[in-house]
Amino acid sequence: MEQNPQSQLKLLVTRGKEQGYLTYAEVNDHLPEDIVDSDQIEDIIQMINDMGIQVMEEAPDADDLLLAENTTSTDEDAEEAAAQVLSSVESEIGRTTDPVRMYMREMGTVELLTREGEIDIAKRIEDGINQVQCSVAEYPEAITYLLEQYDRVEAEEARLSDLITGFVDPNAEEEMAPTATHVGSELSQEDLDDDEDEDEEDGDDDAADDDNSIDPELAREKFAELRAQYVVTRDTIKAKGRSHAAAQEEILKLSEVFKQFRLVPKQFDYLVNSMRVMMDRVRTQERLIMKLCVEQCKMPKKNFITLFTGNETSETWFNAAIAMNKPWSEKLHDVAEEVQRCLQKLRQIEEETGLTIEQVKDINRRMSIGEAKARRAKKEMVEANLRLVISIAKKYTNRGLQFLDLIQEGNIGLMKAVDKFEYRRGYKFSTYATWWIRQAITRSIADQARTIRIPVHMIETINKLNRISRQMLQEMGREPTPEELAERMLMPEDKIRKVLKIAKEPISMETPIGDDEDSHLGDFIEDTTLELPLDSATTESLRAATHDVLAGLTAREAKVLRMRFGIDMNTDHTLEEVGKQFDVTRERIRQIEAKALRKLRHPSRSEVLRSFLDD
């Protein structure tokens, strides 16, 4: 039963009081597991020393021990001091709930790697990937898929660079790195997809260079060799069976030929996933059969495993189970039809793959072991280089992202670097990983730091513009104009103006204005949706003046003008509509309107309204 930190420390102090001394080994044994920080341990040792309990490398002799006991016995406040030690340590433990500190503490427990350690881990990653690659080579669908893709390249329906990145020379003195792949990667599927998108963007820029770097004649020769070996292997398996020594030899040769191809990660991952999907189909049917027999018919699981294993697609195991004349045997008749359907689906999988279910499982098992080996090695490489991420992330603080977010993005870049690292090139991993970490952090800042998101390519243009603008400021002693910036950057002036407009940072409406900080920026921004006080007062005065002027006309004339011009009404009216209202012709309404307007144009009346006309 584990002791809590308080009881462990009490035991340590009590033991020290009884002995008069403590050894470093005893302190280490009795310290709570939470306390791993060297500063905390030193503080505890110092407090124990202050209590009169000496902390030594080894147990002292009898004379020294007697002196130590005398010293300890004279300390009447030992118990109180022990309580102080406990309270200070417990408060220190309580303060370690900060995520950054906890992350740093856990990270500090992993030792840094030497160059030899990096090479050792990189080789283990390669071993795991090689094991996966050998497993894929035994999967007939993988070879046929690769040959089909090459036929598309020959028909100019696809690019060779989308299929392979090159070939491994089997005659080279040192074994070359296997296919670059995401096998065993610590990255999430979303990050892997982003990585592939970036690779595709880069690939579109220099696709011609990539295709030229792969010799088409060599590719034709290698694919012809793969096709020929595949045909020989397939015919041998068909004639003698997969378990025959000759067939195993041909499978090994096919695997060696397949390993010479350095596939694009996307293609290799597709082959691995297709095998995994096939295995999932097998498992689904097997689980269904087991559920029908064990859960529904109450067949003992031990009996089911004994009969089913090795006879997955045969009906003999099911017939044997029925023939056992057990209480559950009769119930198997009820599920016979469903079991037959599942067995038929398993036989269909065997026809599709050209492998038995047992062989599919064996290939998938070896592939999973290789993946696990690569994953463990990649995890070790990542954990040993977490300090590198923090050292780089520190330089990018106060740029819009929290420190933990910077670390997280840097870790994603680190994991990408682990996936792509090739130790044979001679440089240390940290040299290579620094670029990936820095790129991941800068991209995340560009993508997430701004309130209004700006595309990454535009961020790069803004940074370039700011850099050139600072240079020109130093040269000319003043801010450069957009025309001067356009000339220096070889860009159209209107684009420079757009970039300058985009580069402006949004500002808070709550930004205080003035020394008293009582007013905010939002108080000084005009609300265009509301009417200005001056316009409102002018409109009200015009309404009052219009009413006064109309009051000088007859009631009939005033109403005609009100209806014709929509004064104090929702809308204006036509002559026809006004005529119907007064039960007269439209011509009579026009005459009344003309007469009323002539009266209004008289200086005694028009002078009041003329002041409202705009200059």
UniProtKB/Swiss-Prot annotation:
Q: Which domain of life is it from?
A: Bacteria
Please provide one cellular component term from the Gene Ontology annotations of this protein.
cytoplasm
One Pfam family here: Sigma70_r1_1
Q: What is this protein called?
A: RNA polymerase sigma factor RpoD
Which residue ranges does the record annotate as region Sigma-70 factor domain-4? 549-602
DNA-binding region ranges: 575-594
Region: Sigma-70 factor domain-3; residue ranges are: 460-536
Question: What does the sequence similarity comment in the record state about its family?
Answer: Belongs to the sigma-70 factor family. RpoD/SigA subfamily.
Organism of origin is Salmonella typhimurium (strain LT2 / SGSC1412 / ATCC 700720)
Under the heading SUPFAM superfamilies, the entry gives:
Sigma2 domain of RNA polymerase sigma factors, Sigma3 and sigma4 domains of RNA polymerase sigma factors
Q: Which GO terms describe its biological process?
A: DNA-templated transcription initiation
Gene Ontology molecular functions: DNA binding; sigma factor activity
What PROSITE patterns has UniProt attached to this entry? SIGMA70_1 (PS00715), SIGMA70_2 (PS00716)
Renumbered to this chain, the Acidic residues biased-composition regions fall at: 188-214
Q: Keyword Membrane, does the record have it?
A: no
Keywords carried by this UniProt record: Cytoplasm, DNA-binding, Sigma factor, Transcription, Transcription regulation
